[in-house]
A protein has these predicted regions:
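N-terminal leader/linker segments that initiate helical-solenoid repeat arrays
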Residues: 1-37, 45-55, 59, 63-66, ...
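Gram-negative and organellar
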Residues: 7, 65, 70, 99, ...
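Amphipathic alpha-helical segments within well-ordered protein domains
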Residues: 21, 123, 339-340
């Protein structure tokens, strides 16, 4: 039977199965042949038949320890781990130093995720048989499983400690190195991840795996051009010896790199070709869905994610990708469900957890307290104190409120005034792409000679009529409270406004605003502002462009407020921003806008203008953010009075709850 033993030892289980089956035709009661036949069946994927054979053998030879060991192992083949655990425990009571029993028990505990105990018994097995390759291999996989458990619980240091121990057992082991790199990726230690992937790539057979991973690291570092360069290199490295799975991974990464670099036409052609080559394959459908998200074709993206989930309900890309597309489309409840479904299959998966956290943040109640000091070259100065708050009762409905106290004075005229504005209202999502916001309140103004009370309002309808477009229709009723002289005039403005923005898939953007204003002093105003800009960088966000503004008043009352019959301003600007919403805890964020141009006031000669706006903030935690901001401008339209204007302020934002009110119940 030596030929059959060789088949088993070399992993040729089908040949072993056939060999021992033929032996049993001649010798049907041969114990060794039956035992080996059972092993061949089990190792070839027929675990249940193997178990039946071992049970029959145990009925004839109830004290045979080798048969008991094979029966215990067959329980592992059938993934009956709890039963295997109890059985191996009994075997170890019978023979505490049995190497196969210790090894089998350790593997059983590992499958049940009792990794600490599994390590204890694998070490006992290695004491019994020092340096045994099977035991060392089992220890490697126990460490990998244990490390993954630590990763799921967010303990990356403990995970790395275990993985580095693996490298002591198997120097430069590729699986271990890949897991180490993955921990660095998850913990955003991209430099160490990059170094680890480069180590993996030293071996020629792992070069493609290394390049594909290095392209991803470059993307995560915000270096998309480098990612495409690396991925292009990987495509050129493909040969006829490349395995099918690695070939697919490389093509997938190249398509992703094209998408990251906004080369949508090339990506689309490649994905169509892949779809013809691999019809209805999830990895290709995921690429197409991802491309459509980048192009804001969210409905098409959702359709592809649904096809993915039809093929595989547990798909990570399908569940979390769909959640992302639903969120972008305004279907927030469905987005929550899809993200939570991801966590059912991938416990504590970091991307899914972070997605839900970000979605929660959109609906978590908060309060913003703000104070500012401003002055101009007309001897006006003002102190302003403001508080605003939002409280969401659902993904559709939220309460809004604000209070503003402002004092203003003029050192030349001696005029002083104060104003108090209180507004309260609601925001309601009517449809997935339409939201109504309405605030109504009271403005109380007090000068040295009079007190005024006026109704104020802020009502707007925000829509997304087409992809990459936003449209706002609004009405605002407000009091001119820039300085004491204006407050004394008790000028009420009724503003009817339209805001329209258009983004494109080729980095160009356009924003236009129109105001038509009527005032209780019988004056009217028309204001048009338009901005054409180009997005130069994504991280940090950097854009530059040109602005144009036109203002005209029906009546000119320059002694009271800036009210030209015609006013035109042109400027070029750049804006750089690190958004507070993407900033991590204990990190800084910032924004700087600088602009320069010319303004034409009625028939006067052109005047040079400048505008600087900046802010610097720090995120102490996910719940508290402090921001210092300032601005300076000599553009006449920057203030109601047409003066050069400077403002500095401090803003503190605090999230009252840790998560949305409607998700705490």
């Amino acid at each position: 039977m030596n030929e059959g033993f060789t088949y088993l030892e070399t992993g040729k289980y089908k040949q072993a199965e056939t060999f021992f089956e033929n032996i049993l035709i001649t010798y049907p009661k041969n114990k060794t042949a039956k035992l080996c036949y059972g092993r061949a069946l089990g190792l070839n994927g027929n675990g249940e038949r193997a178990t039946t054979i071992f049970i029959n053998l145990l009925e004839r030879y109830p004290q045979d320890f080798e048969i008991k060991l094979n029966y215990a192992e067959s329980l592992l083949w059938n993934e009956n781990y709890n039963k295997a655990k109890d059985y191996y425990k009994n075997l170890l009571e019978e023979k505490p130093n049995s190497f196969p029993a210790l090894l089998g028990y350790a593997n059983t505990l590992s499958n049940l995720k009792f990794f600490n105990e599994a390590l204890e018994f694998i070490d006992k097995a290695l004491l019994t048989s020092p340096g045994n390759l099977n035991a060392l291999t089992s220890k490697k996989y126990i460490n990998l499983g244990y490390a993954n458990q630590y990763v799921q619980n967010g303990d990356y240091k403990a995970a790395l400690k275990l993985l580095l121990k693996n490298l002591q057992l198997f120097k430069k082991d590729i699986e271990t190195l890949q897991n180490i790199a993955n921990v660095y990726l998850i913990s955003s230690d991209f430099s160490k991840a990059e170094a680890t992937y480069k180590t993996i790539g030293i071996s020629p057979q792992n070069k493609l795996t290394s390049l594909n991973s290095l392209a991803l690291v470059s993307h995560l570092k915000g270096k998309n051009k480098k990612a495409l360069e690396i991925s292009s290199k990987a495509i050129n490295y493909i040969s006829n010896k490349t395995s099918e799975s690695l070939l697919q991974q490389t093509k997938e990464r190249y398509a992703q790199a094209l998408i990251w670099n906004r080369k949508y036409k090339k990506a689309d052609i490649l994905i169509q070709k892949l779809n013809n080559e691999y019809p209805n394959k999830n990895w290709v459908l995921s690429l197409r869905a991802s491309l459509n998200i980048y192009k804001s074709n969210f409905e098409k993206s959702i359709n592809d994610y649904n096809r993915i989930l039809k093929n595989d309900t547990t798909s990570f890309d399908g569940n979390l990708g769909k959640a992302n597309a639903l969120k972008a489309s305004g279907y927030f409840i469905e987005s929550y469900k899809s993200a939570e479904n991801t966590l059912k299959f991938y416990k504590n998966q970091k991307d899914a957890v972070n997605f839900i956290k970000k979605l929660d943040k959109s609906f978590t109640p908060f309060v913003v307290a703000e104070s500012s000091y401003s002055f101009d070259n007309g001897n006006n100065k003002a102190y302003s104190y403001k508080a605003t708050s939002e409280f969401s009762f659902s993904t559709k409905f939220k309460l809004l409120g604000s209070y503003n106290y402002r004092t203003t004075s003029n050192s030349l005229s001696g005029l002083k005034a104060t104003s108090n504005n209180v507004l309260g209202g609601v925001s309601y999502q009517l449809l997935h792409n339409i939201k109504l916001k309405s605030l109504i309140g009271l403005a109380s103004s007090k000068t040295e000679t009079n007190t005024f009370n006026q109704l104020v309002a802020d009502i707007s309808l925000l829509t997304k009529p087409f992809k990459l477009q936003n449209l706002e229709l609004g009405y605002k009723r407000e009091i001119q409270n820039f300085n004491a002289a204006l407050l004394a005039e008790n000028i009420v403005q009724n503003n009817y406004l339209i805001n329209y923005s258009l983004n494109t898939n080729f980095r160009l953007g356009w924003f236009t605003q129109y105001y038509y204003t009527t005032q209780n002093d019988k004056n009217t105003r028309n204001l048009i502002f338009t901005s054409l800009y180009y997005n130069i960088l994504e991280k940090p966000s950097l854009k530059a462009g040109v602005n144009y503004q036109n203002i005209s008043f029906k009546n000119q009352v320059p002694t009271i407020y800036f009210s030209p019959s015609k006013f035109n301003a042109y400027e070029v600007f750049f804006n750089i921003i690190k958004d507070e919403n993407i900033t991590k805890e204990n990190e800084w964020f910032y924004e700087l806008t600088a602009a320069s141009g010319f303004q034409y006031i009625e028939n006067s000669k052109k005047q040079r203008t400048y505008r600087i706006q900046s802010k610097l903030g720090y995120k102490f935690s996910e719940r508290s953010i402090l921001t210092l901001y300032g601005s300076k401008s000599n553009i006449a339209s920057a203030t109601a009075a047409g003066f050069t204007f400077t403002e500095i302020g401090l803003r503190f934002k605090w999230f009252i709850l840790r998560k949305p009110f409607f998700r705490k119940r």
